[in-house]
């Protein structure tokens, strides 16, 4: 009986995927790729132009942006590269 109960608990944990965390890229502009673990369920990539040229910011979540700033949000690991 204990074995059956333990088996059910393990199967439940595996099926629910408890503890899953999303990973998003967080490098800026043309820097080498870096990844961070996120509590949010999405990643973002913001783009805008300034006197240096096109700027890119990546991270976790899906923030609000000002007019003139491009925003792409996505929901799979490292989808914002």
Curated annotation (Swiss-Prot):
Gene Ontology molecular function: any one: toxin activity
Tissue specificity note: Expressed by the venom gland.
Keyword Signal: yes
Top-level taxonomic group: Eukaryota
UniProt entry keywords in alphabetical sequence: Acetylcholine receptor inhibiting toxin, Disulfide bond, Ion channel impairing toxin, Neurotoxin, Postsynaptic neurotoxin, Secreted, Signal, Toxin
Xref: InterPro entries: Snake_3FTx (IPR003571), Snake_toxin-like_sf (IPR045860), Snake_toxin_con_site (IPR018354), Toxin_cobra-type (IPR054131)
Positions of disulphide bridges: 24-43, 38-60, 62-73, 74-79
Subcellular location per the Swiss-Prot or TrEMBL entry: Secreted
Primary localization class, coarse: secreted
GO CC list: extracellular region
Pfam families: Toxin_cobra-type (PF21947)
Cleavable signal peptide: 1-21
Family the entry assigns: Belongs to the three-finger toxin family. Short-chain subfamily. Type I alpha-neurotoxin sub-subfamily.
Function statement: Binds to muscle nicotinic acetylcholine receptor (nAChR) and inhibit acetylcholine from binding to the receptor, thereby impairing neuromuscular transmission.
Protein name: Short neurotoxin 2
């Amino acid at each position: 009986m204990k074995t059956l109960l333990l088996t059910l608990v393990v199967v439940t944990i595996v099926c629910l995927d408890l503890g899953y965390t999303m990973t998003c890229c967080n490098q800026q502009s043309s820097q080498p790729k870096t990844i961070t673990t996120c509590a949010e369920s999405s990643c973002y990539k913001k783009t805008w132009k300034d006197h240096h040229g096109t700027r890119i910011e990546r991270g976790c979540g899906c923030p609000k942006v000002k007019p003139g700033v491009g925003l792409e949000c996505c929901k799979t690991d490292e989808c914002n590269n």
